[in-house]
Amino acid sequence: MTLLGLSACSVNARIKKADRKYAIGEYYEAGEMYRQTYRRISNKNKDLRAHVAFMQGECNRIINGSKAIGAYKNAIKNHYPDSIVYLSYAQVLHYQGEYKEAIKQYDIYLEAHPNDYVAQAGKYGCLQVEQWKHHSSRYKIALAKEFNEKRTSNFAPAFISEDGD
């Protein structure tokens, strides 16, 4: 019984410490602390697991980490009470190039908040990318090897006048 009480105190103390790291902007460290804490929380405590998973996702989203996808999935799986989790998850999917899944998550969020401009713009952006993929332009982008040669002495091309100025 005492061991269970110490374990719960340890988890709560770790969450508070991670919250302090998050508050001062140390997102990487806070994300790692949330990740380690998430593993220690019992599967029966869904509310706490959802909160910790969401905070881990927020930390990873802020530092542009792809780990945010898994964290947001865990928060949704554990029934995080705020619908903002769907918007954040959609944004991370959008950044990672998973546009179809991002559109689904934007739609879920827009059911609860139909007038949210950020979600509408995100969904529109995903739809535009899908459309652009099917209707590509005639322009081709190619690597300019002559500017990236290691053995050339031209570090950066420059224009000079006839006087040498």
Predicted region positions:
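Bacterial Sec signal peptide processing site at the extreme N-terminus
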Residues: 7-27, 41
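Alpha-solenoid helical repeat scaffolds
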Residues: 15-16, 47-55, 84-88, 104, ...
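Short, conserved micro-motifs composed of acidic
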Residues: 24, 85-88, 95, 99, ...
